[in-house]
Amino acid sequence: VLPEIHDRFQELRLFVREGVPAELNQDLRGAKHDLILSTQPIAEAGLEISPLFREPLKLVLPLDHRLANKEVINRTDLVGEEVLTIDEHHLYHRQVTELCQTLGATTRRDFEGTSLDTLRQMVVMGMGITFLPSLYVASEIRDSDPLRVTDVFGVNMYRDHALAWRSRSPARPLFRRLAQTIRELVPATGASDLRLLY
C-alpha cells in the first residue's frame, strides 16, 4: 500500500523502520516515532489506536511432510507436531506459541528464525512446519515454491493490525485519514482473506 499512500499523501514524509512491536510502542511513547503500524495488542495509555484489519495465519508445510497431501487438516492432526517460529523477542513468537498450545503442538527451540523469510526457507529445507501471515504468503510464496499453504479446519488463527499515535499529536486528523486510506487499500493487496476492522 505504500506507493498509493505516497501518491495520496504527498505532503507526508514516511520513514519506514522495522522493529519489535514492544520497542516500536516504546519509541512511539518516547516521541522517536510519530506513528506506528503494529500488530495488537498495543498498550493504550496516552495513545490513540485505530484498528485496521485482521490477518489470518496460514499453516505452511514442506511437500514431503506427512500432512502435505491431506485434503483437510484438522487441529487433531497437529497434536505433537513441532512448529518453527521466530525468536522470542518478537510478538509473533508469542502468538505462534499460544496457537501451538491451543493445538497441542510445540514450538521448536533448537531452530528459531530471525524473520518470516528465514522461517519460509527453513520449511523449504524440510526442517519443520510453521504458521505464516497471509499477507506474507500472498507477497512472498509462489506456486513454484515446494510448499503447501493451507488453513487448519475449525481453528480461527489470526493477528490484528492497527495504527497508533500519541493522543496529543497535532497530526491526529492526518493519521486518522491515513488509517482510513489503509483500510480502503487493503482489499487490493492480494490477500483476499483479510477482514477490515474499525
Sequence positions of predicted segments:
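Structural detector for helix-capping/boundary residues
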Residues: 19-22, 31, 55, 76, ...
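Central regulatory/effector-binding core of bacterial HTH transcription factors
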Residues: 1-45, 106, 113
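C-terminal effector-binding regulatory domain of bacterial HTH transcription factors
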Residues: 7-9, 134-145, 154-198
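Generic preference for hydrophobic
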Residues: 16, 35-37, 49, 59-60, ...
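Secondary-structure junction motif
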Residues: 68, 82-103, 171-180, 186-197
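Well-formed, non-transmembrane alpha-helical positions, independent of function
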Residues: 4, 26-27, 51, 77, ...
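Thr-Gly-centered strand-to-loop micro-motif
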Residues: 38, 62, 86-87, 109, ...
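Beta-alpha-beta core module
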Residues: 45-56, 70-71, 77, 117-168
